[in-house]
Amino acid sequence: MLNNQNHNVIITDPKHLSDFKQDVQSILKQMEKEGVVLDLGNDDPSVEGIDKVYMAPSLPDSAPIAKKVAEADLDVITNEDFSKMVNDLIPVDIIGITGTMGKTTTTFITTSIFKQAGYKVWSCSSLVNNLVSEAIIDGIVKGKAQNCDIAIFELPHGTIGLLDELDIKIGLLTNIAEDHLSEFGGSLEKYQQRKLILEKMSEIFIANNSCRDIIAPVRDNALYYALDDDCDFIGTAGDEKLTVRYSKGEFTTPFHMVSYFFENSVGASSVALTYGVSQEDITRALSEFKGLPAHMEDVGEYNGRKVILDSAFLYDGMKITLDYFKDDNVVLFLDHFDTLSKRDKAEVGKLVGQYVDVIIASGFNEVNQKVEMDAAYEVLDAVENPNAVKVATRDITEAAALTFKYSKPGDIILHMGPLIAYDRLTTVEKIMKGLEEGSKKYE
């Protein structure tokens, strides 16, 4: 972004270009084409001729480059400075959506509603780029901020920490659950406080009713939404329909999605209604909504088995998905459950064992690109169902293929885990490869 604003930018890092992941290498090469100077593989970069410095928040004061910057008394661009720059470059209203679960889905549905209402929407979510802050900056550089009527941003906790000075017209909190705590010293309170930065940034704030106990003490004019709870926006799920009641009336829309899509659609509707979108436009959008990739997505039938890809990986989200399929015979295959955060894999095993009789767990860690079979066994060893078939595999492709060995026509093959949220394109590609191989090998 600084390069786009006609500053001369140098990126320095002790790592060589080849040390970065392939997607990061591509981004760095593109930056170089656009005029950014890459000073990589340099353990002792010079600060001569430098006016200002931006340093990664994780860089310790003891790092050699940090000491050089301090000794030279250079101006340091803080996250607050950077966030204000970004805010000044976005001339339209911003809707910001955060939460532990449901933020990607809710962002997608909200975007669909506003597009149906005729708005030219600039939408950024982890569905397109796992690092949403990168997507926002990329959009500014490409002129999207100047070529829209409204911006709708998914705001994960990392993005909120970086862009905490955005002026948000309406902020929405879907929920807060125990996840990512390893990034906050194991403290749920610190994680909650990071999420609550959105409340401070927002002119109007809406939260799931489950969060009322942490929102009410800091904001007395917040609005709340939920399924079947007494609050400002009340949703009621029916057979292929959704009813929303609020202070100005109610409406019922045909709705062809399932499971957590109901509550997320109530959240999206609450944002739209608060902003002034009509019931008619919301109804049209929700009645036509067909879901989004890898969120309770039916990817087809293979050898008489319906295959569903879901990105649920936290206890509550997984339970919602498993409850939906409780009357079906399900063969379940799972990711390695650690990404940037360490997770309780025994809790996963105990939960899934209550619902399914075949559990196949992958031991491949996509973050460090290592096979960690202990992670798969930790899930499987916690399964208390004595009749369960438990299989550990070296990667998700093998896991997907083996689902056909342990299933029969009429069964549901279900995927769950965090890797789709971490790297959707790579993970789905590996899964689809396994499904193709398994359907042929075990037909």
Map each language-model feature to its residues.
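Adenine nucleotide phosphate-binding catalytic loops in nucleotide-utilizing enzymes
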Residues: 185-192, 220-319
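ATP-dependent carboxylate-amine ligase
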Residues: 1-20, 26, 36, 53, ...
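Short, basic phosphate-binding NTP loop
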Residues: 1-96, 117, 287
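Walker A (P-loop) phosphate-binding motif
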Residues: 83-129
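Active-site regions of enzymes building and remodeling cell-envelope glycoconjugates
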Residues: 25-38, 50, 70-76, 168-172, ...
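Flexible active-site lid/hinge loop adjacent to a nucleotide/diphosphate
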Residues: 140-215
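Short beta-strand "acidic-cap" motif of Rossmann-like dinucleotide-binding folds
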Residues: 8-13, 121-123, 152, 224
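Residue-level signal for inorganic ion chemistry
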Residues: 2, 53, 97, 154, ...
